[in-house]
Amino acid sequence: MEVLEEKPKEGKVKLKVETLDDLWHLYHVISPGDIVYAKTLRKQAQRSDSLRPEKVEAIPVFLGVRAEKINLHRFANQLRVTGPIVYASRDDVPLGKYHTIAVEPGMTITIQKERWRSHHVERIKEAVEASKRAKVMIVAMEDGEAEVAIVREYGLDFIASIRHNIGGKRYNVKREDEEKKFFHDVAKTIKDLIERENVQKVIVAGPGFYKENFYGFLRENYPELAGKVVLDDTSMGGRVGVYEVIKRGTVDKVYTETRVAQEIKLVEKVIERIAKDEPVAYGLKDVEEAVNYGAVDTLLVLDELLKGDDRERIEEIMEMARNLRANVVVVSSEHEGGDKLKALGGIAAILRFKIH
């Protein structure tokens, strides 16, 4: 994401949307009541002569829509913002009618808010910083099976599962042929994703020597891919192996700590503190009390809460925590750390001292 222009007095920020991750960030920035401006297509009936029916055409127009519904359609690579039109660049587009702006990578949009909360500003900054970081792919493989995932800002995006039935004993000619076909399939998948997603590093993980054999195959047949590969040991392949790579911190070693890895670590720290009866709070009531005491070191808030009925109350707690110099982290509901935080009420805090 790129910030093109800011107009603080008008509450406007103009942005260049670049990736699917940007759409996810914007989903958590745009709130009901905000106005989103963008070039879009709107179906308009064109008058014809009386003998012919009206012709409906999609005309290009610059619109401002007051957001009522905000939906992220990840598989379509779209963020759809629906609401009444409050501004139109053409006089023949009636104000007040409903329209959906489909925000996609490559588009330029402007967001206007009556009040920009600090967590909205932080989210924009994170998106800009994230666009500068290397994108990482994880391939967890074991004996004819490979799970391929990309580490995104919101969590793990499982892209492909590759499976070949590799039978027979080791060093059997037929088995070696099947294994080579499997390796070719995995390599081609990696190559396609590197080109499509602009991936800079590939972590190949798994138990035993299987990953080393694959790496040797890459060096011989796909040397340009081998240069992007980092090997890691995991107890299993498949999805379990992918999650193990995240927990082991291997992604962090490839580049600065990812948002996903950081969030999972913090949630695990909360759970560990609960088990050891160390300073911690969870659940809305207890966390709010801890913030009022000035006891919070790190506040964790599940992103879903910022779309729910308690949104304003949660935002006030976040503002107060920041004013008291607490670290505030919005945790994605798209990974296992988010699931665990949800089980704790969606909000928790690592405390500087006990309050009870």
UniProtKB/Swiss-Prot annotation:
Enzyme Commission number = 3.1.-.-
Q: Which cofactor does it need?
A: a divalent metal cation
Q: What are the GO cellular component annotations?
A: cytoplasm
Which controlled-vocabulary keywords does the entry list? Cytoplasm, Endonuclease, Hydrolase, Metal-binding, Nuclease
Its domain of life?
Archaea
Q: Which InterPro entries match?
A: eFR1_2_sf, eRF1_1_Pelota, eRF1_2, eRF1_3, Pelota/DOM34_N, Pelota_arc, Ribosomal_eL30-like_sf, Transl-rel_pelota
Task: Give, as one word, the top-level EC class.
Answer: hydrolase
Q: What GO annotations for molecular function exist for this entry? A: endonuclease activity; metal ion binding
Subcellular location(s) of the protein: Cytoplasm
Which SUPFAM superfamilies does the protein's record reference? Answer: Dom34/Pelota N-terminal domain-like (SSF159065), L30e-like (SSF55315), Translational machinery components (SSF53137)
Predominant localisation class:
cytoplasm
Q: Which Pfam families match?
A: eRF1_1 (PF03463), eRF1_2 (PF03464), eRF1_3 (PF03465)
Query: What are the BP-aspect GO terms?
Result: nonfunctional rRNA decay; nuclear-transcribed mRNA catabolic process, no-go decay; nuclear-transcribed mRNA catabolic process, non-stop decay; ribosome disassembly; RNA surveillance
**Record comment regarding domains:** The N-terminal domain has the RNA-binding Sm fold. It harbors the endoribonuclease activity.
Function as written in the Swiss-Prot or TrEMBL entry: May function in recognizing stalled ribosomes, interact with stem-loop structures in stalled mRNA molecules, and effect endonucleolytic cleavage of the mRNA. May play a role in the release non-functional ribosomes and degradation of damaged mRNAs. Has endoribonuclease activity.
Share what the entry says about its subunit structure, partners included: Monomer.
The entry assigns this protein to a family as follows: Belongs to the eukaryotic release factor 1 family. Pelota subfamily.
Put simply, this protein is called Protein pelota homolog
Gene name per UniProt: pelA
